[in-house]
Design a protein with these regions (language model features):
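Conserved acidic, metal-coordinating active-site core of Asp-based
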Residues: 123
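A metal-dependent hydrolase metal-coordination microenvironment
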Residues: 1-120
Length: 123
């Protein structure tokens, strides 16, 4: 059984649209896939010939030595989420904070004469 349960689309840091991913998976004769975008629940349309498992990748940090302020980061893969689950609302808030952070970075770069438009973030 060939499966791929860790795929990113253009909704995250991947390069393919969701429909393209599903088409490629069918061409590769994968039996199951999960699109696990960062902090974004991508739910492709169901298709005959392939099982699509809802998934998401979430970033997390923890204090590796209690009280030391030394943190390690990990990415957690979560499967079988529903679109309206409580975690998806929380992750939407995280995405919005990241968007605002990126806009602030662009403003600071522009002040240093490194010209980047906010619209370039969507590419």
């Amino acid at each position: 059984m060939a499966i791929d349960l860790h795929i990113h689309s253009i909704n995250s840091d991947g390069t393919d649209a969701v429909d393209e991913i599903v088409e490629k998976a069918l061409e590769m004769e994968l039996e199951a896939i999960s699109i696990t975008d960062h902090e974004y629940l991508t739910i492709p349309k169901k298709r005959d010939g392939i099982e699509i498992i809802n998934g998401i990748e979430v970033s997390a940090n923890w204090d590796t030595v209690e009280g030391s302020n030394v943190f390690a980061g990990i990415h957690l893969l979560i499967y079988f989420l529903e679109e309206l689950s409580p975690i998806t609302k929380h992750l939407e808030n995280i995405r919005n904070l990241k968007i605002e952070r990126n806009k602030e970075i662009i403003r600071k770069l522009n002040k240093e004469n490194i010209k980047i438009e906010e619209s370039e973030l969507d590419k």
